[in-house]
Amino acid sequence: MADLWTNYLLPLLIVIGQSFLLLTVLLITIAYILLADRKIWAAVQIRRGPNVVGPWGLLQSFADLLKMVLKEPTIPSGANKGVFLLAPLVSCVLALAAWAVIPVDAGWMIADINVGVLYILAVSSLSVYGIIMAGWSSNSKYPFLAALRSAAQMVSYEVSIGFVIVCVLLCAGSLNLTAIVEAQNSQYGLLGWYWLPLFPVFVIFYVSALAETNRPPFDLVEAESELVAGFMVEYASTPYMLFVLGEYVAIATMCAMGAIMFLGGWLPPLPIAPFTWVPGVIWFTLKLFFMFFMFAMAKAIVPRYRYDQLMRLGWKVFLPLSLAMVVIVASVLQFAGLAPK
C-alpha cells in the first residue's frame, strides 16, 4: 500500500495540483491579454477602450465571462447537436493541453519532455479539427466556408513554422524547450538570443503564428464582410466563450513559443545585477506580453489580406524562404564549426 501511494497516487496528486494551478494562472493571464488586446486597439484608434467595470476597466473580461455564462446556449434546429457542442470543447482543451510542456522558469513546467516543441506543434495542429467540426455541424453555409478556409490556412502556415523549428533545433541541438532556453544563455545577454542571428526566421515565425492563430491581418476565417462571424455564426453563450478562450490560449502559446525560441525564455536581458535579481517567471511574462503587443499592433494597423494573397504568401514566399534558411543555417553551423555537440 505504501508503494502504491509513493509511486502512483502521490505523483498523480502532484500533477493534478500543478495542472489546476497552471490552469488558474493561465486563465487569469488570458483575461488580461484579452483586455490588453481591446485597450491597444482602442489606443491606436484614439479611444479609451473598456474603462467602466473595475478600476481602469481591469475587471471587464470577468464581467464578459459572467455575461456569457448566464446566457442561454442556442442550437440550430438542423445542427448535429453532439458534434456542435463537442467542437468548442475540443478547440479549448487542445489549446490548454499545449501548456503542459511550456517552462515559465527553470524547472517550472508540468512535463519536461525531450520533444516539447514537436508536442506543441502536434497539439496546435489538432485544434483545426474543432473548427472543422463547428463549421460542418452548424448546417449553415457561412460556418462551413469558414471551416474550409481555416483548414487550408492552418495547414499552409504549419509547414513554415515546422522549418522555423528546424532552424532553432539546428542551433540548440535539442527539441527540449528548457535546453533551447539554456542554449541561448551567454555572457552577451539579449545579443546572444536567437532573435539576432536568426532574425529572418523570427519574422517568418511571427507572421506564420499570426496566420496559424487566425489573427488579423489573416483573419479570413472570421471575415465579417464576407462570412458574418465565420465558423462561430451559430454559437452563443458558453460554447462561443470556449471558442474565444481557445483562440486566445493558442495566441498565448505562440507568444510563449516565440519568447522561448527567440527571446531567451526566462533569461534576463543582461546577466548582471540588478537584472538577475528579478525572478525568471517575471522576465518570461514580460516577453510573452511583448510578443502579444506585436500581435495586437498587427491587428490594429495592417488591413486584411485577400484569400489568394494569404495562400500566395504561405506557399510561394514563406515556404521557399524558410527552406532556404534551413539550408543557410545548417551550412553556417557546419562550416564555421558552431554546430552543437
UniProtKB/Swiss-Prot annotation:
Gene name as annotated: nuoH2
Role description: NDH-1 shuttles electrons from NADH, via FMN and iron-sulfur (Fe-S) centers, to quinones in the respiratory chain. The immediate electron acceptor for the enzyme in this species is believed to be ubiquinone. Couples the redox reaction to proton translocation (for every two electrons transferred, four hydrogen ions are translocated across the cytoplasmic membrane), and thus conserves the redox energy in a proton gradient. This subunit may bind ubiquinone.
UniProt subunit comment: NDH-1 is composed of 14 different subunits. Subunits NuoA, H, J, K, L, M, N constitute the membrane sector of the complex.
Stated family: Belongs to the complex I subunit 1 family.
HAMAP family hit by this protein: NDH1_NuoH
Compartmental location: Cell inner membrane
Top EC class, one word: translocase
Cellular-component GO terms for this entry: plasma membrane
Catalytic activity: a quinone + NADH + 5 H(+)(in) = a quinol + NAD(+) + 4 H(+)(out)
Any Gene Ontology biological process: aerobic respiration
Protein source organism: Rhodopseudomonas palustris (strain BisA53)
The protein's name in its UniProt record: NADH-quinone oxidoreductase subunit H 2
Keywords: Cell inner membrane, Cell membrane, Membrane, NAD, Quinone, Translocase, Transmembrane, Transmembrane helix, Ubiquinone
Bilayer topology annotation: Multi-pass membrane protein
Membrane-spanning ranges: 13-33, 82-102, 115-135, 161-181, 190-210, 242-262, 277-297, 317-337
Alphabetical list of PROSITE patterns matching this protein: COMPLEX1_ND1_2 (PS00668)
Main location: membrane
MF (Gene Ontology): NADH dehydrogenase activity; oxidoreductase activity, acting on NAD(P)H, quinone or similar compound as acceptor; quinone binding
Keyword Cell cycle: no
EC numbers: 7.1.1.-
